[in-house]
Swiss-Prot record:
GO cellular component: cytoplasm
Species this protein is from: Corynebacterium jeikeium (strain K411)
Protein's recorded name: GTPase Obg
PROSITE patterns with a match to the protein in the record: G_OBG, GTP1_OBG, OBG, OCT
Annotated compartments: Cytoplasm
Swiss-Prot/TrEMBL GO biological process terms: ribosome biogenesis
Top-rank lineage group of the source organism: Bacteria
GO MF terms, alphabetically ordered: GTP binding; GTPase activity; magnesium ion binding
InterPro entries: G_OBG, GTP-bd, GTP-bd_Obg/CgtA, GTP-bd_prot_GTP1/OBG_C_sf, GTP1-OBG_CS, GTP1_OBG_dom, GTP1_OBG_dom_sf, OBG_GTPase
Pfam families according to UniProt: DUF1967, GTP1_OBG, MMR_HSR1
Residues noted as binding GTP in the record, renumbered to the chain: 166-173, 191-195, 212-215, 292-295, 321-323
Main location: cytoplasm
Binding site for Mg(2+): 173, 193
Domain OCT: 371-444
Length: 503
């Protein structure tokens, strides 16, 4: 089972919005209570939060499918549905979020920093919120919007102070095991280390962290070997330590050649970086050279032969043996001094917790008018596509099983100018029109240039046909019953309906 996971693909489904409620108030002696349907609750968001208690993406490796809670539906008596609970996923500091195309969306640093990675759908309005002067009791409500569904990639970049770099089998894992309490896998063959190992080194009352990353080979910046899986873990390190096998017997390998090959790959990788990590150019960070395996016969003689050339790099040189535990204390104190100097020269400001909202996140567009565009559908004749965030949201929220809801949608589209735009684009009655995921045959409600009808198609006729007697009529009915007036003695145009008077 993997213990360290630094790259995962998540399949996210934010919570759907709850549906609005279509309800009419019912109460004794209140026959015309009016609409009282409540709104649906918003769906839950999926949020990434930086936590100091998490150091790997291991949990997401086993549970990549993540779904947030749905909003509750509205109910009668103006009861609104509860909002779906947000789902907060804790990630380690240094996590980079990429979209499905591999493009970086956000770099999560700073404890408590949050990012809304998938937005929940908005709840639908109930018929109480849809009532107006011309539509007194709508017999429909709006549906809740579906939550965002997307795939994102999480990549973890190590946040160590010192990064151990070197060719495979140079002794990096052995070094971190003797400097700290880390227990990496150690064996005498290349690429024993396949994932980074992190260790904490105590130097008196001070500490620094060190990362043992997978071995490097020529062409790593182009993806060879472990390639970018190695290189991204040294982007954030403050100090780079070249670990060199001083006892290598290969003809084309020596300490100087190894370091030059490593530096070439680092330079190539720096040119590919899209943004600065905050620690400056990777090629300008402090470096040290660690000649390992000095306990091997002839290793010291080989190091002596290369001493002058190694000094030309201008970096401190340390000779150690992880097997014999020689030179380790001197190395630890030297690394601590370099780390302290680098921290002082590059102070890291404590970033306050913030909420990051990526540009691609779906959100409701404000304003009274809907922006849209109409274009011909290239895949079919006499077909058109209408694109617009607000227009497409109207489609998602319409219950197409309810004729009154469809009429309400048609009114909204006409008032927004969609019909006029379709006329100008060359559409005729019967043309196929696609909005969002819905395709329908266009049945224009108005001729070109004619104003839209003011009375909405969703008007409830029942409330306009009032059959109750007026107070004056009830008064005259009472007088007629008592014989004060003749019940047939009415003015022209009046109709005597005893049942109505007495009702």
């Amino acid at each position: 089972m993997p213990q360290f996971v630094d790259r995962v693909v998540l399949h996210l489904q934010a919570g759907d919005g709850g549906h609005g409620c279509a309800s009419v108030h019912r109460e004794k002696f209140v026959p015309l209570g009016g609409p009282d349907g409540g709104n649906g609750g918003h769906g839950g968001d999926i949020i990434l939060e930086v936590s100091s208690q998490v150091h790997t993406l291991l949990d997401f490796h086993f549970h990549p499918h993540i779904k947030a809670q749905r909003g509750n539906n509205g109910a009668g008596d103006h009861r609104h549905g509860a909002r779906g609970e947000d789902l907060v996923l804790q990630v380690p500091e240094g996590t980079v979020v990429l979209n499905s195309k591999g493009e970086a969306i956000a770099d999560l640093t700073g404890k408590g920093t949050r990012m809304i990675v998938a937005a929940g759908g908005h709840g639908g309005l109930g018929n109480a919120a849809l009532a107006s002067k011309s539509r007194k009791a709508p017999g429909f409500a709006l549906l809740g919007e579906p939550g965002e569904a997307k795939d994102v990639i999480l990549e973890l970049k190590s946040m160590a102070d010192v990064g151990l770099v070197g060719f495979p089998s140079a002794g990096k894992s052995s070094l971190i095991s003797v400097l700290s309490a880390a227990k990496p896998k150690i064996a005498d063959y290349p690429f024993t280390t396949l994932v980074p190992n992190l260790g904490v080194v105590n130097v008196g009352h001070e500490v620094f962290t060190v990362a043992d990353v997978p071995g490097l080979i020529p062409g790593a910046s182009e993806g060879k070997g472990l390639g970018l899986d190695f290189l991204r873990h040294i982007e954030r390190t403050a100090v780079l330590a070249h670990v060199v096998d001083a006892a290598s017997l290969e003809a084309d390998r020596d300490p100087v050649a190894d370091i030059k090959a490593l530096e070439k790959e680092l330079a190539n990788y720096q040119e590919e970086l899209a943004s600065d990590s905050g620690l400056g150019d990777l090629r300008e960070r402090p470096r040290v050279i660690i000649l390992n395996k000095m306990d091997v016969p002839d290793a010291a003689d080989m190091a002596d032969l290369q001493e002058e050339e190694l000094k030309e790099f201008g970096w401190p040189i340390f000779r150690i043996s992880t097997v014999a535990h020689k030179g380790l204390d001197e190395l630890k104190y030297a690394l601590m001094d370099i780390v302290k100097a680098h921290r002082k020269a590059n102070p890291v400001e404590e970033k306050p917790a913030q909420v990051i909202t990526p540009k691609g996140l779906r959100k409701r567009s404000g304003g009274r008018f809907a922006e849209f565009e109409v274009e011909a559908d290239p895949s079919a004749e006499d077909a058109f596509i209408v694109r617009g965030e607000k227009i497409e949201r109207w489609i998602r929220q319409t219950d197409f099983e309810n004729d009154e809801a469809v009429g309400y949608l048609a009114d909204r589209l006409a008032k927004a100018g969609v019909e006029e735009a379709l006329y100008k684009a060359g559409a005729d009655a019967g043309s196929e029109v696609t909005i969002g995921e819905i395709t329908f045959e266009w049945d224009p409600q108005t001729a070109a240039g004619v104003d839209v009808m003011r009375s909405g198609r969703g008007t409830d006729v029942r409330l306009e046909q009032n059959t109750r007697a007026t107070p004056e009529e009830r008064k005259r009915a009472s007088q007629a019953r008592r014989g004060l007036i003749d019940e047939n003695d009415f003015g022209d145009g009046e109709v005597a309906e005893r049942e109505r008077w007495q009702g």
